[in-house]
């Protein structure tokens, strides 16, 4: 292995990075979707914030993939591969209220941060300090995005999101249930460890 990390650890770490990469791509596209389709009195501020957040997400895709390759693992190969690994739900609704956009992105960022922490723990436990260090930065960026979304919610009447629980292997609980005519996705177990 190019990194000196045990082959079994490389497989697990690369698999966790592939899932994170799929999640980041899914969140990037959802963020751009909402950036393109937001409307209402807070259009400009939300539109600009979401554009910046989408750019930040896209900026970490290459480092995630290249880190998997640098340790001797593989990464995503196609849109289909991405779709099979992503856990964040897509949102194909024709209309989403701005407050629901912010709420959904907030919960998705929180879920992503939880998964990143699980990957960080995996890396630390397998002696991959470099990947763990990169994940620390990505966790910080994800928490910052969530903070921006939460701070923006007060302007559109969504202070109820503070304290909404999210667990590592599931979608958010009953504190927020948007109704897009689609049933919420079922809980999924994480398989990083």
Q: What are the residue ranges of the model-derived segments?
A:
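Helix-loop segments that flank and shape redox-cofactor active sites
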Residues: 4-12, 27-52, 117-130
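Conserved alpha-helical segments that form or flank metal/cofactor-binding pockets of metalloenzymes
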Residues: 42-81
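Short, intrinsically disordered C-terminal tails of secreted or membrane-associated proteins
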Residues: 179-192
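A structural signal for well-ordered alpha-helices, especially hydrophobic packing surfaces
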Residues: 21, 28, 35, 54, ...
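Disorder-to-helix initiation segments
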Residues: 1-20, 98
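Acidic/histidine-rich alpha-helical segments that form the ligand environment
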Residues: 66, 80-137
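Basic polycationic patches enriched in arginine
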Residues: 171-173
């Amino acid at each position: 292995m190019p990194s000196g990390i045990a082959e079994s650890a490389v497989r697990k770490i690369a698999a966790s990075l592939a899932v994170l990469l799929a999640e980041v791509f899914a969140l990037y596209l959802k963020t751009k979707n909402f950036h393109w389709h937001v409307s209402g009195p807070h259009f400009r501020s939300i539109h600009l914030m979401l554009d910046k957040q989408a750019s930040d997400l896209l900026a970490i895709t290459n480092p995630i993939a290249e880190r998997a390759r640098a340790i001797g693992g593989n990464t995503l190969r196609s849109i289909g591969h991405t779709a099979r690994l992503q856990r964040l739900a897509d949102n194909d609704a024709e209309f989403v209220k701005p407050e629901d956009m912010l709420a959904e992105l907030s919960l998705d960022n929180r879920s992503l941060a939880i998964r990143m922490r699980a990957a960080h723990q995996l890396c630390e436990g397998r002696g991959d300090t470099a990947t763990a260090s990169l994940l620390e930065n990505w966790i910080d960026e994800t928490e910052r995005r969530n903070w921006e979304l939460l701070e923006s919610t007060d302007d559109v009447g969504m202070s109820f999101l503070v304290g909404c629980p999210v667990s590592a292997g599931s979608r958010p609980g009953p504190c927020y249930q948007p109704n897009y005519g689609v049933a919420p996705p079922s809980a999924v177990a994480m398989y990083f460890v």
